[in-house]
Amino acid sequence: MSKREKIYSSVISEFIKDKNSSILVIGAQLADKVAFYSAGFTNVLLSGYDERKLAYEPYEWVKENGMSLSFDEKTFDYVVTHNVLHHMSSPHKGLTEMYRVAKKGVLVFESRDSFIMQVAERFELTQKYEVAGCYETSGVDGTNVPNFIFRWTEREIEKTINTFSPAFKHRFVYRYWSIYPDGPDLSSFKKIILNFIRPFYFLFTKLFSKQQNGFAFFIEKPTDNSTLNPWLYFDNNKLRLEVDNNWVRNNYKKNRNKR
């Protein structure tokens, strides 16, 4: 297994303890099959844009658009994707779709929009568009058009989920690592620069771990009303969420405006 596959397998085992959990993988490749199989998971459904016939056994594969999944809410215990959201024309929509069909949690592996990555982009030491590694069906939305590499921050992830599901308090967990770029599309001079700064990069990221270029984020999905935000409660008579006006009066000088 490559370093990336070992990280993948290790992280999914950390966050998904039950090997029999129902899991949907978005944008699945053979690396996904290897990671889950190596970690001992049994109930995994792989999905993707295209209809390539690959050796996915013992798992099943279905064709799905990650930004518009055909499944009902809370169909799977967990939904996972590995370096796929940045291939979508709307990565945020892909993330909220994962959240929608998950019951317990969402696990995503992506590139982090760290300060170092922003500097690397500025000096063209890394790609902004995934041109060098693009082949048929690997571009934006499963086409051969190279995608923009959308890199994430923790704040953006949390804003996206809290906007999509504002009633609940969410738990976000992050894990960081580095896959040092080899610059396949760079000139010889820039490759020399990359090799020169390599030890300084690893020293810097050892001190400041969030500056690494790769991370995984786990979003634990609320499973009951105990995780509601304090200004809300579930009305058992109306069978819906309501605003707790007593909480509002106690925490704000004036009642919120009635509409």
Q: For each of these PLM feature ranges, what is it?
A:
Residues 2-20:
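Conserved alpha-helix/loop element of class I SAM-dependent methyltransferases that forms part
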Residues 24-68:
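Class I SAM-dependent methyltransferase SAM/SAH-binding core
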Residues 61, 170-259:
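A C-terminal cap/extension of S-adenosyl-L-methionine-dependent methyltransferases
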Residues 68-73, 89:
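Short conserved loop adjoining the S-adenosyl-L-methionine
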Residues 80:
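A conserved beta-strand element that flanks and buttresses the S-adenosyl-L-methionine
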Residues 92-108:
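A short glycine-rich, Lys/Arg-flanked "PGG" loop and its adjoining helix->strand segment in the class I
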Residues 104-136:
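Conserved class I S-adenosyl-L-methionine
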Residues 145-174:
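Short alpha-helix
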